[in-house]
Amino acid sequence: MRKIILCSPRGFCAGVIRAIQTVEVALEKWGRPIYVKHEIVHNRHVVDKLREKGAIFIEDLQEVPRNSRVIFSAHGVPPSLREEATERGLIAIDATCGLVTKVHSAVKMYAKKGYHIILIGKRKHVEIIGIRGEAPDQITVVENIAEVEALPFSAQDPLFYVTQTTLSMDDAADIVAALKARYPRIFTLPSSSICYATQNRQGALRNILPQVDFVYVIGDRQSSNSNRLREVAERRGVTARLVNHPDEVTEEILQYSGNIGITAGASTPEDVVQACLMKLQELIPDLSIEMDLFVEEDTVFQLPKEL
């Protein structure tokens, strides 16, 4: 019998839960409005619900009235933005994911030691912009192997590398291998800077791919980790669609006769997953549902001390 295989874990990670709760608790404690620098997480459903509750999402701190509260998003911010907030008398509350903060701290420490930092990631992504701000003159961003091959450093130069927390493990491994081939003495952290949730969601998806011929990744198109999930499937020859609303689950699926995999990015609410699942069952009523558990997650991050 044809079936839907639901990946587990999927959806919200500990950092996303903490970030959303930070905004919700701030609104409960101080009332509206609460300003948020950038979308708190990259998911339109989450942002719209928080906006309805009184959150105001801004990209420029000049939009925030003096002496107001502003929350920094889960993706992190450069030190210059923290300084600007202080200069403008803003009360900053930091919802940066702890695993992103770990990368900031490592970059800052190794830059002070005189290393040049190779930062693997998407240079326009807000997380990379924040990390690069820790030591802009000592950081080079690389997105692919070609950019590794173009690096101007010698094998003797003191180099340190880290990655964006939401990268594809496949792509990161290829880039790291190229880096180590050129620079055998390059340093890094003892454990991967790709976060546990990214690794788990990609691992869970890889686990089911031999059993399916089509995958729905439920997530926002702006979400890095959701896009990487789609790429994980496509890299292994499985058709994948990134959807963020049940209306995007279309009759296209009727062209496929095999099992269907479903996963969700780390900023995707479970109710959106369930709505997409219901739409799929309307299109193909005789589908059974099977849960595939890859690993249990029990990570919890404490809310900022101000709350």
Swiss-Prot record:
GO biological process: dimethylallyl diphosphate biosynthetic process; isopentenyl diphosphate biosynthetic process, methylerythritol 4-phosphate pathway; terpenoid biosynthetic process
Binding site for dimethylallyl diphosphate: 42, 75, 125, 223-225, 267
Location of the active site: 127 (proton donor)
InterPro entries associated with the record: LytB/IspH
Catalysis: reaction(s): isopentenyl diphosphate + 2 oxidized [2Fe-2S]-[ferredoxin] + H2O = (2E)-4-hydroxy-3-methylbut-2-enyl diphosphate + 2 reduced [2Fe-2S]-[ferredoxin] + 2 H(+); dimethylallyl diphosphate + 2 oxidized [2Fe-2S]-[ferredoxin] + H2O = (2E)-4-hydroxy-3-methylbut-2-enyl diphosphate + 2 reduced [2Fe-2S]-[ferredoxin] + 2 H(+)
Cofactor annotation comment: Binds 1 [4Fe-4S] cluster per subunit.
Enzyme class: oxidoreductase
Any one GO molecular-function label of the UniProt entry: 4-hydroxy-3-methylbut-2-enyl diphosphate reductase activity
Pathway of action: Isoprenoid biosynthesis; dimethylallyl diphosphate biosynthesis; dimethylallyl diphosphate from (2E)-4-hydroxy-3-methylbutenyl diphosphate: step 1/1; Isoprenoid biosynthesis; isopentenyl diphosphate biosynthesis via DXP pathway; isopentenyl diphosphate from 1-deoxy-D-xylulose 5-phosphate: step 6/6
Cofactor: [4Fe-4S] cluster
Chain's role: Catalyzes the conversion of 1-hydroxy-2-methyl-2-(E)-butenyl 4-diphosphate (HMBPP) into a mixture of isopentenyl diphosphate (IPP) and dimethylallyl diphosphate (DMAPP). Acts in the terminal step of the DOXP/MEP pathway for isoprenoid precursor biosynthesis.
NCBIfam families: ispH_lytB, PRK01045.1-4
Entry similarity comment: Belongs to the IspH family.
Protein name: 4-hydroxy-3-methylbut-2-enyl diphosphate reductase
